[in-house]
């Protein structure tokens, strides 16, 4: 599994548009100060995700995600999760939880988001939900994000081609 958090803001992300030269096209926007905190892990073998919407991403919300992952994988003896070096993944509370857990964390080298497949997943999520979409109310925005995860099965064919573990080893 690959794990990371994302923090999309309640504001449209304009990815492309065709506007005739000399014309203006107003784009609706919000304050952009409200955002969601989404912590998640994706299993690229089964194309399934465990997702949490939390007020903040910290050690407590990370442990809650671990518990959710363990409940979703009752038959697994060990669960390896690949993640970045976020402070909350290395916290004392998380380390203590992992001592009696079936989860093993495998930390990626610093500054290597290209090795964490969930980064591609988050980009796909944002492309589907945020790009060129305007949500007047924050609740509409939050519901659209939640709908994406509820309907994740409909995206599996595209995700299978996007979330491949084709890494090339270079150097020694």
Give residue ranges: language-model regions.
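Catalytic-core regions built around general acid/base machinery
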Residues: 93-102
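Structural signal for conserved beta-strand scaffold positions within catalytic alpha/beta enzyme cores
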Residues: 2, 51, 107-109, 131
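C-terminal anion-handling pockets and recognition modules
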Residues: 119-172
């Amino acid at each position: 599994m690959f794990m990371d958090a994302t923090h999309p803001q309640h504001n449209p992300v304009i990815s492309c548009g065709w506007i005739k030269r000399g014309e203006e096209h107003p784009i609706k926007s919000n304050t952009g100060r409200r955002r969601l905190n989404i912590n998640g892990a994706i299993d690229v073998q089964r194309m399934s995700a465990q997702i949490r919407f939390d007020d903040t991403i910290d050690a407590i919300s990370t442990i809650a995600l671990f518990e959710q992952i363990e409940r979703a994988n009752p038959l697994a003896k060990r669960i390896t999760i690949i993640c970045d070096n976020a402070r909350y993944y290395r916290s004392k509370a998380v380390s203590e939880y992992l001592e009696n857990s079936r989860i093993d964390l495998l930390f990626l080298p610093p500054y290597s988001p290209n090795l964490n497949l969930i980064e591609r997943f988050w980009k796909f999520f944002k492309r589907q939900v945020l790009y060129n979409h305007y949500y007047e109310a924050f609740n509409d925005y939050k519901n659209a994000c939640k709908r994406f995860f509820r309907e994740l099965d409909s995206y599996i064919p595209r995700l299978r081609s996007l979330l491949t573990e084709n890494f090339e080893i270079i150097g020694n």
